[in-house]
């Protein structure tokens, strides 16, 4: 999806993952009302270490379909009750 591709471009440009070739982007449309989500997950197998049967989530990016603003839980200590941050982070 174009949304997942956009997130992938930001993640790679900002070097938010150690091994970009070992990461997948899972697009979940309308995960929340008017919010699309892209889960950034570990890709295992081939040259990537880890159990090929699993794809643990690293973090997620939440995209508002109306405003196209993005937030992520990349910096949240508590994935459930924490506060999402603007994505990409403004340095």
Residue positions per predicted region:
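Mature, folded catalytic cores of secreted/periplasmic enzymes
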Residues: 9-12, 21, 53, 57, ...
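Short, non-transmembrane alpha-helical segments in secretory-pathway proteins
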Residues: 1-26
């Amino acid at each position: 999806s174009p949304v997942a591709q956009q997130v992938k471009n930001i993640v790679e440009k900002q070097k938010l993952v150690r091994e970009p070739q070992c990461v997948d982007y899972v697009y979940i449309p309308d995960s929340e009302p008017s919010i699309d989500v892209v889960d950034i997950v570990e890709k295992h197998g081939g040259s990537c270490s880890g159990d090929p049967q699993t794809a643990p989530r690293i973090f997620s990016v939440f995209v508002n379909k109306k405003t196209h603003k993005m937030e992520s839980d990349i910096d949240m200590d508590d994935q459930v009750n924490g506060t999402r941050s603007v994505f990409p982070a403004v340095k």
